């Protein structure tokens, strides 16, 4: 197989987005558009990926990192000019180069693979990905000869009235023989209505040289959607959400209301899990088998075990075990690890805490910067007092300990194995194992106190 290369065009400013955020960094289902494009392209076993950057270059580099090399297009002088900036990386290489727009987040590796196969089968020097649009206004048109071969591609602004009637459009995705591309691109001129160097002109030059030019028509116009404004962004979001949700349902996940369920492209969900409306799964969220998630639950970059129930709660950058019950209205903050068969109840906040198997915090508690052992019971209103205004300190609660209601554990402090803390205590010193800690004022009852104050 020939070497494969890809060039992502991501240098446009995107003024129609009316945003301070660089266009290709606008997220679709929680993931920047350009990263959708890069991840799909990388599935094609590329020898090299080059992203053309301009406005917001550093932000794009930060987002894609080591996935790509980068070439700067300092002035936006057209698509051919943009591709030309990749010449230092690709000039002289033998193989096939795919050119993709960074604002086409719905384009799949499967479609690009089909285009590459068409390119190879036809022995073409260039192949364009086309689609049929009900309303082709604004798109370049594919002009074919009588025998059906691609004759040229005409930009909308340069098209004649007759050419504008054509509904087969240029999607802006191409593949080229790499050596032919960088030879011919030097011949492209800017003699057109926009005064720009158009990449489709490479097709016409190759055609004039007698080279074979092919076209692969995808049957899915939605997949080729280019995002240029917030309306198109919302359409891309809708189409991507439908695609993601359909894939999970086909893999054995029940979505009670797919229209109101939001799942990241990179999320993984096990079979027989049920997702209720209002659930948002972000980033690298991973859900096990037979879970119940939602309604109104947000899980981000977290791993959830099997048979776990999470209702009306938030889990962020944490790990949750099997057979756990969380919520309603619980918050698992970053760097927490929740064991198996745990209960985290209503209005409980866990932060940077190791929470052992079968332990419980059922109501109205804050457990932060703590190590909680197995079989621990934290009563209603249990608080780890972890911050002195300058520094956070660790609280250790060992296996089998029992913390009574409305107790404050002032860190750094350790409650030993099997120890009890009496309700209402403020514990400032370590509690030995099997001991009872009582740290509260002794109750005093003053007889007839109320009667006497009313006499005054």
UniProtKB/Swiss-Prot annotation:
The EC number(s) attached to this protein equal 2.7.7.23, 2.3.1.157
Assigned keywords, A-Z: Acyltransferase, Cell shape, Cell wall biogenesis/degradation, Cytoplasm, Magnesium, Metal-binding, Multifunctional enzyme, Nucleotidyltransferase, Peptidoglycan synthesis, Repeat, Transferase
Residues binding acetyl-CoA, per UniProt: 386-387, 423, 440
Instruction: Cite the InterPro entries for this sequence.
Output: Bifunctional_GlmU, GlmU-like, GlmU_C_LbH, Hexapep, Hexapep_transf_CS, NTP_transferase_dom, Nucleotide-diphossugar_trans, Trimer_LpxA-like_sf
Stored NCBIfam families: glmU (TIGR01173), PRK14354.1 (NF010934)
The record's similarity note reads: In the N-terminal section; belongs to the N-acetylglucosamine-1-phosphate uridyltransferase family.
Q: What is this protein called?
A: Bifunctional protein GlmU
> Which PROSITE patterns does the record cross-reference, listed alphabetically?
HEXAPEP_TRANSFERASES
What does the subunit section of this Swiss-Prot or TrEMBL entry state?
Homotrimer.
Cofactor section: Mg(2+)
- Which Pfam family, any one of them, does this sequence belong to? Hexapep
Task: Show the catalytic activity.
Answer: alpha-D-glucosamine 1-phosphate + acetyl-CoA = N-acetyl-alpha-D-glucosamine 1-phosphate + CoA + H(+); N-acetyl-alpha-D-glucosamine 1-phosphate + UTP + H(+) = UDP-N-acetyl-alpha-D-glucosamine + diphosphate
This entry carries the following GO cellular component terms, namely: cytoplasm; membrane
What's the gene?
glmU
Which cell locations does it reside in?
Answer: Cytoplasm
List positions binding UDP-N-acetyl-alpha-D-glucosamine.
Answer: 9-12, 23, 73, 78-79, 140, 155, 170, 228, 333, 351, 366, 377
Name a single GO biological process: regulation of cell shape
- What is the enzyme's main class? transferase
The cofactor note reads: Binds 1 Mg(2+) ion per subunit.
Linker: annotated span: 231-251
According to the record, the residues making up region (Pyrophosphorylase) are 1-230
Coarse class of the primary localization is cytoplasm
State its role. Answer: Catalyzes the last two sequential reactions in the de novo biosynthetic pathway for UDP-N-acetylglucosamine (UDP-GlcNAc). The C-terminal domain catalyzes the transfer of acetyl group from acetyl coenzyme A to glucosamine-1-phosphate (GlcN-1-P) to produce N-acetylglucosamine-1-phosphate (GlcNAc-1-P), which is converted into UDP-GlcNAc by the transfer of uridine 5-monophosphate (from uridine 5-triphosphate), a reaction catalyzed by the N-terminal domain.
Q: Where is the active site?
A: 363
Q: Where is this region: N-acetyltransferase?
A: 252-456
